[in-house]
Regions:
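Active-site neighborhoods and metal-handling regions in enzymes and metal-associated proteins
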Residues: 1-370
Length: 370
């Protein structure tokens, strides 16, 4: 991964956003910028310096993983050490005509910092340094994947997709949802996955109407839909897919609902291309379901970015103005959920290309009856 290049680009962005330094605390952002995969660390980036702070537990790991930044092992903890370093380096903006230097602006990831942590940081800094909420600079950069990241995502998608075969082997009337999830998760680990991307969703019968119906101890009924939503983490990158199967013999109504979701998903995928607004993809999916009379049962957004985290930018939700760009990897996952009856969702990961898009998920979207 080009960690040094990412750091240099961020340094350029700092001046554009009138920041003298950025304090990076969110572990996925730290990993993206310098390669560190541990849970305790802070990366400070200024116009000239890049310094990574961690504690003694991670000395060896930091030396093995961190790229492009000086490593400081902090006995007093990363936050206190980072604050002391900022105070000692006398950051300040250029003085205006006839005036002294203005306080330096230290950008913080406010969405990833607790109020208590921010208060401790502010108390540790001199008055010459002011905290400022930083825009989602790193998250925006992460939304466009380079070739190495895309290769990692392809591998994660392929491994994740292979687990659907294990689900089909396990799903039977009377089998607990948690048993299906356990078989899939064991197969993932055996195949080399670092972890699951999120808690596996196996929702059967009436529970399939729960969009996030994580696997329960409920037994799969003799008749009805089973929603399987799952993903793996491989080399740090996540996969995400959903398939819905039917246990028993699906009625004409059940097939019709499934077909409506399948058509909406295909219409949305067909709309993915550079330059289109993220909200427009959501609109396409809803319009298709509206034509089928099912739009009122589609209760969540159409998709999201995927990468080092399972939910990243962009958000494919109503009214979202962000424009899709080549290199973005997104999910497209419309669903229909009729409370107390059933639910259907189909989800693929999709790469935005220069001329359109590529569906990364290799698994068939046709209805499987068990």
């Amino acid at each position: 991964m080009d960690h040094r290049g990412r750091q240099q680009r961020l340094q350029h962005f700092l001046s554009n956003h009138r920041l003298d330094a950025l304090l990076v605390v969110h572990p996925p952002n730290i990993r993206y910028l310098c390669g560190f995969t541990g849970s305790a660390g802070i990366l400070v980036i200024t116009g000239k310096n890049r310094v990574f702070f961690t504690d003694g537990r991670y000395t060896g790991q930091a030396r093995a993983e961190v790229k492009g930044a000086k490593i400081v092992i902090a006995r007093q903890g990363p936050l206190a050490a980072a604050a002391a370093w900022l105070a000692a380096n006398r950051l300040s903006t250029k003085p205006k005509s006839g005036r002294g230097a203005s306080p330096a602006r230290i950008g913080i990831e406010s969405e990833h910092m607790t109020v208590a942590t921010r208060s401790r940081l502010a108390a540790a800094l001199p008055s010459s340094l002011r905290l400022r909420e930083a825009p989602a600079l790193i998250e925006q950069a992460r939304s466009i994947k380079d070739e190495e990241e895309i290769a990692c995502l392809r591998s994660a998608v392929n491994l994740g997709s292979s687990l659907f075969d294990r689900a089909l082997e396990t799903i039977r009337p009377g089998v607990r949802e948690t048993d299906v999830a356990a078989e899939m998760e064991y197969a993932a680990r055996k195949a080399g996955a670092e972890a699951m991307s999120f808690e596996t969703i196996i929702a059967s019968g009436a529970r399939s109407a729960l969009p996030h119906g994580r696997a329960s101890h409920a037994a799969i009924p003799a008749e009805g839909f089973v929603v399987c939503d799952f993903g793996v983490i491989l080399t740090g990158y996540c996969s995400d897919m959903t398939r819905t199967v039917y246990v028993g013999r699906p009625s004409a109504e059940a097939r019709g609902v499934y077909q409506a979701v399948q058509q909406a998903q295909q219409a949305a995928v067909d709309g993915v291309k550079p330059g289109i607004k993220a909200g427009e993809i959501d609109h396409i999916a809803r319009k298709s379901l509206r034509n089928s009379g099912l739009a009122k049962y589609f209760t969540h957004s159409t998709g999201h970015g995927v990468g080092l985290e399972i939910h990243e930018l962009p958000r494919l939700a109503a009214g979202q103005p962000e424009v899709l760009l080549p290199g973005m990897v997104i999910t497209v996952e419309p669903g229909v959920y009729v409370p107390g009856k059933w639910g259907v969702r189909i989800e693929d990961m999709v790469l935005v290309t220069e001329r359109g898009c590529e569906v990364l998920t290799p698994t068939s979207r046709e209805l499987v009856a068990i």
